Amino acid sequence: LYFNDKERTSALISICSLLNILLPDSQPNKKIYDSFEKFINSINLENWIFLYIFFEINLIKELGFDTNLTEYSNNIGDDKNFLKIKIDGYIYEIPNYLIHKKIPENFTNLLIRKSLYFSRQVIQNKFFIPNNLLFPKSRIILENYFN
Protein backbone atom coordinates (compact mmCIF):
# COMPACT_ATOMS: atom_id res chain seq x y z
CA LEU A 1 0.00 0.00 0.00
CA TYR A 2 2.76 2.50 0.92
CA PHE A 3 5.68 0.89 -0.88
CA ASN A 4 5.44 3.28 -3.82
CA ASP A 5 5.68 6.26 -1.45
CA LYS A 6 9.21 6.48 -0.10
CA GLU A 7 8.45 9.17 2.47
CA ARG A 8 5.59 7.25 4.09
CA THR A 9 7.50 3.96 3.98
CA SER A 10 10.49 5.66 5.54
CA ALA A 11 8.28 7.10 8.29
CA LEU A 12 6.91 3.66 9.13
CA ILE A 13 10.40 2.15 9.26
CA SER A 14 11.58 5.09 11.35
CA ILE A 15 8.79 4.72 13.91
CA CYS A 16 9.37 0.99 14.20
CA SER A 17 13.11 1.51 14.65
CA LEU A 18 12.63 4.18 17.32
CA LEU A 19 10.10 2.08 19.22
CA ASN A 20 12.28 -1.02 18.97
CA ILE A 21 15.27 0.82 20.44
CA LEU A 22 13.54 3.00 23.04
CA LEU A 23 10.78 0.82 24.48
CA PRO A 24 11.58 -1.85 27.07
CA ASP A 25 10.83 -5.44 26.05
CA SER A 26 7.61 -7.05 27.27
CA GLN A 27 6.31 -3.84 28.82
CA PRO A 28 2.92 -2.70 27.51
CA ASN A 29 2.41 0.99 26.91
CA LYS A 30 -1.17 1.64 25.86
CA LYS A 31 -0.72 5.38 25.24
CA ILE A 32 2.17 4.85 22.84
CA TYR A 33 0.30 2.01 21.12
CA ASP A 34 -2.82 4.17 20.72
CA SER A 35 -0.72 7.04 19.37
CA PHE A 36 0.98 4.67 16.91
CA GLU A 37 -2.37 3.26 15.81
CA LYS A 38 -3.75 6.77 15.30
CA PHE A 39 -0.76 7.63 13.11
CA ILE A 40 -1.12 4.44 11.04
CA ASN A 41 -4.80 5.18 10.47
CA SER A 42 -3.93 8.73 9.35
CA ILE A 43 -0.96 8.02 7.10
CA ASN A 44 -3.02 8.56 3.93
CA LEU A 45 -3.86 12.15 4.87
CA GLU A 46 -2.10 15.03 3.15
CA ASN A 47 -0.70 16.32 6.45
CA TRP A 48 0.57 12.89 7.60
CA ILE A 49 4.11 14.17 8.22
CA PHE A 50 2.85 16.55 10.90
CA LEU A 51 1.06 13.65 12.56
CA TYR A 52 4.38 11.81 12.49
CA ILE A 53 6.10 14.78 14.14
CA PHE A 54 3.41 14.98 16.83
CA PHE A 55 3.83 11.23 17.33
CA GLU A 56 7.53 11.75 18.07
CA ILE A 57 6.81 14.64 20.45
CA ASN A 58 4.24 12.45 22.23
CA LEU A 59 6.74 9.57 22.36
CA ILE A 60 9.27 11.83 24.06
CA LYS A 61 6.62 12.77 26.63
CA GLU A 62 5.50 9.18 27.22
CA LEU A 63 9.10 8.11 27.78
CA GLY A 64 9.34 10.55 30.67
CA PHE A 65 10.52 13.81 29.18
CA ASP A 66 7.92 16.46 28.45
CA THR A 67 9.29 19.38 26.45
CA ASN A 68 6.55 21.63 27.94
CA LEU A 69 6.39 23.66 24.73
CA THR A 70 3.13 25.38 25.70
CA GLU A 71 4.95 27.41 28.35
CA TYR A 72 6.66 29.29 25.50
CA SER A 73 3.38 30.40 23.88
CA ASN A 74 3.72 33.94 25.28
CA ASN A 75 7.11 34.36 23.59
CA ILE A 76 5.77 34.04 20.05
CA GLY A 77 5.53 37.12 17.87
CA ASP A 78 3.06 37.35 15.01
CA ASP A 79 5.75 37.63 12.35
CA LYS A 80 7.89 34.70 13.49
CA ASN A 81 7.56 31.15 12.21
CA PHE A 82 10.24 29.81 14.54
CA LEU A 83 11.28 30.39 18.12
CA LYS A 84 14.60 29.66 19.80
CA ILE A 85 14.16 28.10 23.21
CA LYS A 86 16.43 26.56 25.80
CA ILE A 87 15.56 23.18 27.26
CA ASP A 88 17.91 21.60 29.80
CA GLY A 89 20.90 23.57 28.55
CA TYR A 90 20.29 22.89 24.85
CA ILE A 91 19.10 25.61 22.48
CA TYR A 92 16.50 24.50 19.95
CA GLU A 93 14.85 26.34 17.09
CA ILE A 94 11.29 25.15 16.92
CA PRO A 95 8.36 25.93 14.64
CA ASN A 96 5.58 27.86 16.36
CA TYR A 97 2.89 25.35 15.41
CA LEU A 98 4.52 22.82 17.76
CA ILE A 99 4.05 25.24 20.64
CA HIS A 100 0.37 25.70 19.79
CA LYS A 101 -0.07 21.96 19.04
CA LYS A 102 -1.91 22.87 15.87
CA ILE A 103 -1.14 21.56 12.38
CA PRO A 104 -0.32 24.47 10.05
CA GLU A 105 -2.55 25.13 7.07
CA ASN A 106 0.37 26.10 4.84
CA PHE A 107 3.56 24.13 5.06
CA THR A 108 6.90 23.96 3.32
CA ASN A 109 9.77 21.52 3.27
CA LEU A 110 11.70 23.98 5.46
CA LEU A 111 9.00 23.86 8.13
CA ILE A 112 8.87 20.06 8.00
CA ARG A 113 12.66 19.74 8.04
CA LYS A 114 13.04 22.05 11.05
CA SER A 115 10.27 20.19 12.87
CA LEU A 116 11.91 16.83 12.25
CA TYR A 117 15.28 18.26 13.22
CA PHE A 118 13.88 19.56 16.52
CA SER A 119 12.32 16.25 17.51
CA ARG A 120 15.47 14.36 16.44
CA GLN A 121 17.68 16.63 18.54
CA VAL A 122 15.49 16.18 21.63
CA ILE A 123 15.33 12.40 21.15
CA GLN A 124 19.10 12.22 20.70
CA ASN A 125 19.89 14.50 23.65
CA LYS A 126 17.49 12.77 26.04
CA PHE A 127 17.71 9.11 25.07
CA PHE A 128 20.35 8.16 22.53
CA ILE A 129 23.45 10.13 23.57
CA PRO A 130 23.13 9.52 27.36
CA ASN A 131 22.60 5.78 26.78
CA ASN A 132 25.24 5.49 24.03
CA LEU A 133 22.68 4.20 21.53
CA LEU A 134 22.94 4.41 17.75
CA PHE A 135 20.31 6.66 16.19
CA PRO A 136 18.35 4.87 13.43
CA LYS A 137 19.46 5.72 9.91
CA SER A 138 15.88 5.34 8.74
CA ARG A 139 14.97 8.42 10.77
CA ILE A 140 17.72 10.49 9.16
CA ILE A 141 16.67 9.23 5.73
CA LEU A 142 13.13 10.42 6.44
CA GLU A 143 14.46 13.85 7.36
CA ASN A 144 16.51 14.01 4.16
CA TYR A 145 13.40 13.60 2.01
CA PHE A 146 12.43 17.13 3.04
CA ASN A 147 15.71 18.85 2.09
What are these regions (language model features)?
Residues 1-147:
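Non-catalytic alpha-helical scaffolds and adjoining flexible linkers that form interface surfaces
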